[in-house]
Amino acid sequence: MLKKIVTALGMSGMLLASSNAIAEDTTTKNDNLSPQSVDLSPLRNLNKLDSPMDKDYNYHQAFKKLDTEQLKKDMQDLLTQSQDWWPADFGNYGPFFIRLSWHDAGTYRIYDGRGGANRGQQRFSPLNSWPDNVNLDKARQLLWPIKQKYGDAVSWSDLIVLAGTVSLESMGMKPIGFAFGREDDWQGDDTNWGLSPEEIMSSNVRDGKLAPAYAATQMGLIYVNPEGPDGKPDIKGAASEIRQAFRAMGMTDKETVALIAGGHTFGKTHGAVPEDKVKQAIGPAPDKAPIEQQGLGWHNSYGTGNGDDTMGSGLEGSWTSTPTFWNHDFLHNLYNLDWKKTLSPAGAHQWTPTNAKPENMVPDAHKPGVKHKPIMFTTDLALKEDDGFNKYTQEFYNNPEEFKEEFAKAWFKLTHRDMGPKSRYIGPWIPEQNFIWQDPVPAADYKQVSTQDIAQLEQDIINSGLTNQQLIKTAWDSASTYRKTDYRGGSNGARIALAPEKDWQMNEPAKLEVVLTKLKEIQTNFNNSKTDGTKVSLADLIVLGGNVGVEQAAKQAGYNIQMPFVPGRTDATQAQTDIESFNYLKTKSDGFINYTDGSVSADKLPQTLVEKASMLDLNIPEMTVLVGGMRALDVNYDNSQEGVLTTTPGQLNNSFFVNLLDMSTQWKKSDKKDGEYIGIDRKTGKQKWTASPVDLIFGSNSELKAVAQVYAENGNEQKFVNDFAKAWHKVMMLGRFDVQQ
């Protein structure tokens, strides 16, 4: 029925932007593109170009002038200041703002780190017009006077999450804390949200399984259809979809139950418009609404158009008799009332009790003295009927304080999951407790290495017997796990020495162990030799080793460079590392080292290179110079010679670009290996080189070729080396939120 309602609202034809996801099988926009027309848009920082802020604007600096206590008080006051243009249910906007925050943060998915509350994407299309976000445009509008008052000192993305958190506290649910630090985007991103992005409410489930890389079971929903799978009131099927959807955003069964049961303690759902009047009464979503509505969508011509006549999901009613107070009545009703399937006025599947007592009746949201039966969604009943969920609903029902504590922790995780490590948090309400999902690293309790120490360690590395290639590839494999979407990964923590990273195929475990063993030996000897409290971490040594390898390779090519090095990384422990969670950082292909696990078709490899570069926050020239340098350095996965277009392998020079653009070479597809190309001397017919689609894209794509030509030009040899060094240092510093950059 929800799908029918959405269609009636005129949203089924809404087009959504397409994929930027790393997972090859979720790409939509580029499915029909040939390699030479690879989409480079992920490498263009359009948000920065579109920002109206001054170039020197720094949110962390602007935040310092924010009176956080006054902001909180203003937010608390707003909750009970009902506006005629959008009256508050039960005289309190708290439940409305909880939904706003939840739906903002709930788009996060652990597969690629996309979605979430950071950067305030809910303000833009397509998210602002999703059916699951119906009427949240009004919630953001209610916040506008506060945003206007505090201006640049608080971001929209922080304000939206704060609204829900303050609402919880005002209604008796004490949060464990709140962190500021989210920065705003200025345009909608091009994340791929569904298998059929052209059709709202189309299913992302195939044969009962949520498709990889998605976190919602249907396009336009945050998690699952509350009526049941694809609108069918199937409790068992709903349980399966709930579990898959919440796991896709990194939640356990316990956290899932806490969030749903806790969230449905508050507020109501809206489906007051009769089914036969929905199509006529409800206008289009914000991105298709008439210009005079000024960004507000879903205009409702039925009755008053708001209050008791509000139309939202199509389901109608409240879960508890106290919808603006924290308690465990949701769980009490779930277990003590007998639920019968029925339809809302709008025709949506929901459940009402057959044995409701006066104390179970819920107040009308706008008419004093009027009472209604409580309701449950099909997805709510799944928390009771599914054995895995039942374990926790029973536990929480019998232990209200535990329920409160677990909800508070789950809410904090929900609203902060995409912010990255704790070092990115700012503000006065940051909880002292660390959580494993924050990918914690220990604080340094020792003195950092001096310039003299660094010189000594560099010499120790040179004398270790490790090759430049070993050092460079290990440093790359460590740092290149970073992804800018949720600020995870990177060199800090040295998790390449821990499970699961040490066992990843792309890291060549046996070879990696040789390097790590030698670096640990250097670390131990150095630390034992110091009597002044100075120590070096393995994480720092891995990066320093990569720098040494680059410097030595440049020297062999006739260039003297000094790589910048910023110590301060620390080493995480295995106990601080969630193996399942970190496995999502494992990439299917890494074009910088010509690696693929075989699951990505050859013609998609150039695009996955772009996606990898985007995750590393690189632009087009940085990606280009890094690939060219890595090929010259001869650091491909498994010693592959594909793309090593040089007669001086291991030297840092521009030979890759010079030879790629040399017209004395003719390229042909290999008849022996899919995705391999053979470079043949046009005169002799003899084979000169082999290359991958990733290599040849730099001579095929017009934009990439233009950059490649710059690096192949006479006189730009030193520029190439310098640019490679800068790009290399940038990658090594990804995730270093502990230092000012």
From Swiss-Prot:
EC number(s) on record?
A: 1.11.1.21
Q: PROSITE patterns, alphabetically?
A: PEROXIDASE_1, PEROXIDASE_2, PEROXIDASE_4
Where in the sequence is the active site? H103
Question: Which N-terminal residues, if any, form the signal peptide?
Answer: 1-23
Which Pfam families does the annotation name?
A: peroxidase
Modification after translation is described as: Formation of the three residue Trp-Tyr-Met cross-link is important for the catalase, but not the peroxidase activity of the enzyme.
Q: How is the cofactor bound?
A: Binds 1 heme b (iron(II)-protoporphyrin IX) group per dimer.
- Would the keyword Translocase be found if you checked this record's keyword annotation? no
**Site entry: Transition state stabilizer:** R99
What is the reaction catalyzed? H2O2 + AH2 = A + 2 H2O; 2 H2O2 = O2 + 2 H2O
Its transmembrane ranges are none
Matches recorded under InterPro entries: Catalase_peroxidase, Haem_peroxidase, Haem_peroxidase_sf, Peroxidases_AS, Peroxidases_heam-ligand_BS
Alphabetical GO CC annotations of the entry are: cytosol; extracellular region; periplasmic space
Amino-acid positions noted as binding heme b in the UniProt annotation, renumbered to this chain? H264
Any single GO molecular-function term of the entry would be:
metal ion binding
Keywords recorded for this protein, A-Z: Heme, Hydrogen peroxide, Iron, Metal-binding, Oxidoreductase, Periplasm, Peroxidase, Secreted, Signal
Enter cross-link residues for Tryptophyl-tyrosyl-methioninium (Trp-Tyr) (with M-249). Answer: W102-Y223
A single GO BP annotation from the record? hydrogen peroxide catabolic process
The primary site where this protein sits is secreted
Recorded hits in CDD domains, A to Z, give:
catalase_peroxidase_1 (cd00649), catalase_peroxidase_2 (cd08200)
Instruction: Point out the cross-link Tryptophyl-tyrosyl-methioninium (Tyr-Met) (with W-102) in this chain.
Output: Y223-M249
Listed under subunit, the entry gives:
Homodimer or homotetramer.
The record's family statement is: Belongs to the peroxidase family. Peroxidase/catalase subfamily.
Q: What does this protein do?
A: Bifunctional enzyme with both catalase and broad-spectrum peroxidase activity.
> What protein am I looking at?
Catalase-peroxidase
Q: Which organism is it from?
A: Francisella tularensis subsp. tularensis (strain SCHU S4 / Schu 4)
Give the gene symbol: katG
